[in-house]
Amino acid sequence: MNNPWSNFSSAFGCPIQIPKQNSNVPPSLPVPVGVFGVPLRSGCSNQMAFCAPELTDRKPEHEQKVSKRLNDREEDKDEAAACSLDNQYDRKIQPCIDLVDSLRKLDIGNDLMLPAIAVIGDRNSGKSSVLEALSGVALPRDKGVITRCPLELKLKKMTAPQEWKGVIYYRNTEIQLQNASEVKKAIRKAQDIVAGTNGSISGELISLEIWSPDVPDLTLIDLPGIAREAVGNQPQDNGQQIKTLLKKYIGCKETIIVVVVPCNVDIATTEALKMAQEVDPTGERTLGVLTKPDLVNEGTEETVLKIIQNEVIPLRKGYMIVKCYGQMDFCNELSFTSAIQQEREFFETHKHFSTLLDENKATIPHLANKLTDELVGRIIKTLPAIEKQVHDALQQAKKELQKYTQSTHPTVSDKTIFLVGLIKAFNEDISQTMHGKESWFGNEIRLFPKIRREFRTWGVKLLESSAKVEEIVCSKLPKYEDQYRGREFPDFISYWTFEDIIKEQITKLEEPAVAMLNKVIYMVEEKFLQLANKRFANFQNLNNAAQARIGCISDRQATTAKNCILTQFKMERIIYCQDNIYADDLKAARAEGISKDTKIKDLAFGCASRQCPSFALEMVSHVKAYFTGASKRLSNQIPLIILSTVLHDFGNYLQTSMLHLLQGKEEINYLLQEDHEAANQQKLLTSRISHLNKAYQYLVDFKSL
């Protein structure tokens, strides 16, 4: 006979070296140790999905197998070694599960993705019966939804004979339970307080801890059964509320999903399995549990077997089958041991399902072992990631706490240094913004690209004005010819006419330039205010001082910039250009000619003009030539004025003004006075850091086991 442990390996990937043994002597086994020193439960393969078959030879006849199980229950020769292995495994299970329970109790769920087992099922699927069998306590049973809040079941196995003990937690309430019979009433009361008495659903967690020698070391989260329609006085949207709540829990990548399905229904139609497939399409995190095998119609047993053998809807973690004791068993005070014995006898004597017992795929004890193995395996696998999450969250919380003063900067000297640091950081933000290097997040746009957009619009405005020169000349020349021509002969180019047309066009650009200035200064002021709110959010007085300076400097720089722009346009109305530059622009304008759309023939200059439109052509060329140079000048000059006065000077003056706050040392306490909201936030951060430090210590202590 082959050594039964030859293929044995750790549940967490660590192979075991088995020494050669005499075939007639039970093997002496080393304890397999996985990651963080967790040994493998006896009888489990490295996949943690199937257990080693029993080693006794059995005859194929069903009657002989039943007789052998019921009348001759000899212990296997390897029981001693296996029991020793189980004991060492069990000593590691509880610390492993307690670790995650302790982390979850610290209320740092937003920082960590903790492994969990969530139990879901359609209404009347037998979900509550499975949980009752695992926990050994009766749960509330009402018409409609039984579980109306997420119920966390923390089962703690006691090694030495001790009295049963339980504790229920909800809304900062802790109630001690002295007897298992008190659980049902306590849960119903908690659900009524948390979710109300009208059958509503709540996402608030209720936690129940049970210590008993008859329970496995296991933590489960019982979720409301999926209801297709409301019952009684329940809200009509109960079904949707339940689905939303379930997706919140089973959608977490670290959650193992236990789907409870009755044997006497079409598994493909169950809502619970459909929801599990939505969030876990590969079935990697899902375990199916079939219930009510005693209600299977005769002739359909093979269909159930195919489901359990993963031939219908495959799941990576496979399927198990259980027969739970019902409410009547609780009423008759059927003991836990007797109920387990009855379930085992059912499978041992069943013509079709007895083989499942051989494969450890049936009964509540095997389900408990399976769930424990899966949870421990998930915990071990995610411990490095959890440790990193705790470390990162702790560093981030400490960084945020540095924004506050009361606990970290108690003395005036410390506060002065802290204020210097705050102002220095703010001034650095201003400097980075001035040079277009400020930090940004997500889809946020930096300030300089926003300003550049306005400058681009200004450039387009100048191009449009330049393009309209021909049309303007054609519309203005008749008026100047008829109303303003002096003693000059027709077709002579009038410099005064040329100058008036240029001045009029330049003046029209003054208003858009000032409008652009106002837009840009609003952007700059808004950005600087955002930076002040970011750096000084926890210090209202300091923030107010910064905002007052920003507003004052903004008004002053807006006036300065506007005066500079008006001065620039005043100079532009003095028609002047270097001869060589103008000559080049005129040459280019003459070469380009007048566009085909210009209707020179419609000009009414007099007889001579109508016969020869050269005067109009020449005037258009001169106006275009000058306006080309003026446009280039204004296209750069106005943005330079705005950048200089509204961005750079504004930023420099603001930085200097903020440094002046350091001169009044008697005002430091006033400036660093925290508002009520900031004080509360500081307390929350301090508490969060304390919890994260505890979490980190839990991880360190666990690794040292």
Swiss-Prot record:
Q: Which GO terms describe its cellular component?
A: cytoplasm; microtubule; nucleus; plasma membrane; presynapse; synapse
Q: Explain what the record says happens when changing D72N.
A: In strain: WL-N
MF GO annotations: GTP binding; GTPase activity; microtubule binding
What induces or represses this gene? By interferons.
Domain Dynamin-type G, residue spans = 111-384
Q: What is the effect of changing Q505R?
A: In strain: Black Minorca and Fayoumi GSP
Q: Where is this region: G1 motif?
A: 121-128
Q: What is the effect of changing K143E?
A: In strain: WL-F
Listed A to Z, the keywords are:
Cytoplasm, GTP-binding, Nucleotide-binding
Which positions does UniProt annotate for GTP binding? 121-128, 222-226, 291-294
Q: Which spans does this entry mark as compositional bias, Basic and acidic residues?
A: 60-74
Protein name as catalogued: Interferon-induced GTP-binding protein Mx
Quick one: which gene encodes this? MX
